[in-house]
Amino acid sequence: MMQPDIEEWEILSAGEMHRSIQLGNGKELVSVGKLTIEEYAQTLQETYAGISLMCSPHPSYPPLEMSVFDVKTITNTYANKDLKDFNGNMVSLNNISPMNIATHLTEICKAYRPQVEHVTANPLYVKNEHVFDFIKDIKEILG
């Protein structure tokens, strides 16, 4: 089923530059290539939904960054890593078949609202005030 307002949506791919990919029904995935940090932040501020799949269990920051910018983010589980509880903007899938991703993306897009209320989700990640609290303990032990 196609999104009723699909003609209003722009579909972008950030990262490695690639040719545009025709998606059907007059829509294409447009590559914007690698973005500066400022361009990346601006793009996230203007984005409602995104897909960022992990290909290793190592830290994968794009889905985290997208979700704290209030982007409804689809990602995947990988081995023992599951971001589903990171915040309410994260959708973490065990099954990343194209049909399953499309189904979840359609659900997200059907819930689209022009104004997305900002909620400071996962403030420990966002504010990052006490990252190295353990250093004082190490100093005391070694002291």
Task: Write out the residue ranges for each language-model feature.
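Conserved catalytic-core segment of nucleotide-activated headgroup transferases in glycan assembly
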Residues: 1-26
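Active-site donor-binding acidic/aromatic loop of nucleotide-activated sugar
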Residues: 26-36
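Acidic donor-binding loop of glycosyltransferase active sites
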Residues: 42-58
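Nucleotide-sugar-dependent
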Residues: 53-63, 68, 82-84
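Short hydrophobic beta-strand element within catalytic cores of glycosyltransferases
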Residues: 71-76
